């Protein structure tokens, strides 16, 4: 009797102070009309089938919500979207592999996934064609991220000439990238596209690019010089913020506006050409 009473007191104490009680999670289920998921003993979620994932909300929680047993996610060929709020709070999620069939990532899909640092892709052009939801969203975030193309870590990037735009957050925080060559087919670079690429030293931007988003090269601390394309009309918020080794920049005559803190922290910037 005393033993049972003691156990009850422990349970009640946990509830009062807010200590979470761990329950056994399901290991398989559906996450779309034609999609299923499985969780193995190593903490890997595999999503397979065809079509779109369900879009979740905070009142319609994903089966993966706040699941700290998930270490990696593999999304197989045939899956076309990652649902909104799909992996919110998966604090131990460290890597994700996405297929070339993926075309959309829903808003807040990876919110509070602070350890998500490795992204595996199989096709660069298809990766850069992914659309993101209306909410501020990304796959990788922060710094010290790793991008792998066919299991090889990406360092130098030559964007395929079938690509027409580089989406927001595309290479955010990928610290291994040293140089990027962008083809004439590209017309825009999205917000934070190369933000926190700490090893990025060289970017070749063609004159076909007429829009460069806010924060696009923010915190690229190894970038030393850059020439902006002749058709852009503004320099966005914090575009080169804290590019501490940037010493030379060539600006086009088309510039009519420079937004807040565009060159703040560029302590070595002494050569500006127009």
Regions found by a protein language model. Name each.
Residues 36-38, 85, 107-111, 130:
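Short, T/G/N/S-enriched strand-turn elements that build extracellular solenoid repeat scaffolds
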Residues 26-46:
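GGW-centered surface loops in extracellular recognition modules
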Residues 18-27:
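Sec-dependent signal peptide cleavage junction
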Residues 9-18:
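Bacterial N-terminal signal peptides
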Residues 1-10:
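Bacterial N-terminal signal peptides that target proteins for export
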Residues 83-86, 106-109, 167-170, 190-195, ...:
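Consensus positions within tandem repeat domains that build extended binding/scaffold surfaces
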Residues 42-51, 68-81, 91-104, 114-130, ...:
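Structural signature of tandem-repeat unit edges
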Residues 53-69, 171:
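Extended Gly/Ser/Thr-rich low-complexity repeat segments
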């Amino acid at each position: 009797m005393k033993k049972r009473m003691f156990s009850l007191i422990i349970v009640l104490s946990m509830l009062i102070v807010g200590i979470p009680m761990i329950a056994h999670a399901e290991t398989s289920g559906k996450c779309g009309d034609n999609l299923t998921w499985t969780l193995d003993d190593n903490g890997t979620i595999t999503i397979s089938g065809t079509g779109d994932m369900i879009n979740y909300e905070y009142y319609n929680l994903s089966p993966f919500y706040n699941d700290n047993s998930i270490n990696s996610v593999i999304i197989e060929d045939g899956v076309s979207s990652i649902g909104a709020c799909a992996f919110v709070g998966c604090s131990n999620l460290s890597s994700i592999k996405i297929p070339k069939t993926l075309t959309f990532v829903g808003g807040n899909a990876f919110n509070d996934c602070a350890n998500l640092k490795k992204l595996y892709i199989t096709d660069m052009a298809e990766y850069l064609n992914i659309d993101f939801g209306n909410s501020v969203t990304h796959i990788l975030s922060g710094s010290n991220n790793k991008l792998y193309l066919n299991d090889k870590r990406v360092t130098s990037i030559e964007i395929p000439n079938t690509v027409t735009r580089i989406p927001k957050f595309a290479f955010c925080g990928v610290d291994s990238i040293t140089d990027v060559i962008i083809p004439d087919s590209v017309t825009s670079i999205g917000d934070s596209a190369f933000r926190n690429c700490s090893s990025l030293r060289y970017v070749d931007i063609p004159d076909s690019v007429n829009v460069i988003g806010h924060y696009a090269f923010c915190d690229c601390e190894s970038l030393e010089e850059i020439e902006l394309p002749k058709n852009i009309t503004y320099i966005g918020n914090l575009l080169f913020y804290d590019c501490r080794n940037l010493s030379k920049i060539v600006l086009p005559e088309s510039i009519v506006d420079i937004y807040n803190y565009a060159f703040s922290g560029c302590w070595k910037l002494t050569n500006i050409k127009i």
